Amino acid sequence: MKTNILKGLLIAILFLQGVTVSSQQGQNDNTKKRQIVLFDGKSTNAWKDIKSDHFPDSGWVVKDGVLTVLAKTDNQAGGHDIVTMEQFSGFELELEVRLSEGANSGIKYLVTNTYPGSKGQYLGLEYQLIDNEKHPDALLGRNGNRKMAALYDILPARENIKINPPGEWNKVKIIVDGNRVEHWLNGEKVIEYDRTLDCFKELVRITKYNKLENFGGQEQGHILLQGHGNEVSFREIRITTLE
């Protein structure tokens, strides 16, 4: 029984990564595009701490045109997650990311405050950022779905992708066009999936997100940069809306 389930999920993964949604072909022909710089190398006005209504006073630094979340150490707490002030539906997000050795982080999108309250918890689909060689979480999950550029805990990126090592910059792009989503890394598309397909929903069902109503089905949400206890740097963050 377990073997049949795993085979079915593997087939689903292969299908999702090769899917073409014909109903959305040409959808962008009449869209109104709006380009927004989310980080220009200086200003953090587009972002806020998930625990407040403003950019964090500590844990993140801007230097030489780079936005960096600090690592958690014995002497410093490290940075919290930050989210965009604005919410987005259809968009093309582009940025460059530099991991420190052994780092683990992520870029979440279509993020909502799932558990509002004094602290809140912002959850959404996640583009995994991780040092595949040095962080143990990369070996967990299923079929590589916690490795670099994966849709965290749901879908793995395709094999043999080009990843620049820690200390070097990687170019990341995330496209959300209706229900079709793409992950890109260093100029190559590494994942494509449709959020409405039953096979996608089945993959969500076997994750820790299975108790969240309509996880992954949000029409709009924030962009989130994750503070996960490791130093990670970001630059050239911009988004083009597809409305």
For each predicted feature, which ranges?
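Carbohydrate-interacting regions of secretory-pathway proteins
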Residues: 24-243
